[in-house]
Amino acid sequence: MAPQSKRSGGRKQKKHVPNGVAHIQSTFNNTIVTISDASGDVVSWASAGSSGFKGAKKGTPFAAQTASESAARRAMDQGMRQIEVMVSGPGAGRETAIRALQGAGLEITLIRDVTPIPHNGCRPPKRRRV
């Protein structure tokens, strides 16, 4: 018979992570907040869609705030206190998401805009005619 391992089944142990990085990806249609530790392993994440918003409401600043609070709460449960914020994209929820992280009790040490800017890359979508 093969030797049994000592580890019992079940959920992974929560690790204590004092500081990390929050990536906020804000598009016109949704806002995704991912909080990772310093090495890049994801601690918690939330999006406007996972917070219960559907359709056009996912692109609103309030949906971004709700998603940000949800991700921050889960990260703080694992001991996170300080974060650096990387913001990407042109969406409406950028500032609101940052404010919600601060309001949840996380100390923001750095805010950096990492939106990719093309050096004349892909052709943009055609202008809307309403």
From Swiss-Prot:
CC annotations in GO: ribonucleoprotein complex; ribosome
SUPFAM superfamilies referenced in this protein's UniProt entry, alphabetically: Translational machinery components (SSF53137)
Keyword Secreted: no
Extent of the signal sequence: none
GO biological-process terms attached to the record: translation
Comp. bias regions, Basic residues: 8-17
Pfam families, A to Z: Ribosomal_S11 (PF00411)
GO MF entries: rRNA binding; structural constituent of ribosome
Keywords from the UniProt entry: Ribonucleoprotein, Ribosomal protein, RNA-binding, rRNA-binding
Region (Disordered): 1-21
InterPro entries: Ribosomal_uS11, Ribosomal_uS11_bac-type, Ribosomal_uS11_CS, Ribosomal_uS11_sf
Family: Belongs to the universal ribosomal protein uS11 family.
Subunit structure: Part of the 30S ribosomal subunit. Interacts with proteins S7 and S18. Binds to IF-3.
Cited function: Located on the platform of the 30S subunit, it bridges several disparate RNA helices of the 16S rRNA. Forms part of the Shine-Dalgarno cleft in the 70S ribosome.
Record PANTHER family: 40S RIBOSOMAL PROTEIN S14/30S RIBOSOMAL PROTEIN S11
Name of the protein this chain belongs to: Small ribosomal subunit protein uS11
Organism: Acaryochloris marina (strain MBIC 11017)
Gene that specifies this protein: rpsK
